[in-house]
């Protein structure tokens, strides 16, 4: 995902347009739309798209600041390892996880209670990567 959305699409749009709304926004919106799964997520599908859109904007920011997709790729890798191999939802992608949550993507009440923690971890990961880029 990072190679296409940040490594290719963001770079191509950045070479053609000056506005960050274009070269950060378009790849982030497309990234978010790619995470729309109403069959699996039910009424949570839209909030998951919002989560993915914010994640896309943060990764676009890292790519722009670093001048390479390396930091965004690293943060995305850590996010996916955590979500798929450490603690996962009990769905088709969670088969290798060490722990499963007691709720699935379609459980609106439980997932919405958990999402603020996930949003906070996303922001902390982004800030840590930005701090590392300063050094």
Positions of PLM-derived features:
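Transmembrane helix-loop-helix hairpins at the membrane interface
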Residues: 1-135
């Amino acid at each position: 995902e990072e190679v296409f959305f940040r490594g290719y699409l963001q770079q191509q749009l950045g070479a053609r347009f000056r506005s960050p709304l274009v070269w950060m926004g378009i790849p982030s919106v497309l990234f978010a739309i790619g995470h729309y799964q109403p069959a699996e997520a039910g009424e949570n599908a839209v909030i998951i798209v919002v989560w993915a859109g914010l994640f896309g904007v943060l990764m676009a920011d890292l790519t722009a600041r670093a001048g390479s997709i390396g930091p965004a790729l690293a943060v995305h890798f850590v996010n996916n390892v955590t979500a798929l191999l450490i603690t996962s939802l009990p769905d088709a992608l969670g088969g290798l996880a060490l722990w499963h949550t007691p709720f699935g993507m379609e459980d609106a009440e439980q997932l919405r209670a958990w999402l603020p923690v996930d949003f906070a971890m996303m922001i902390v990961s982004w800030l840590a990567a930005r701090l590392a880029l300063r050094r």
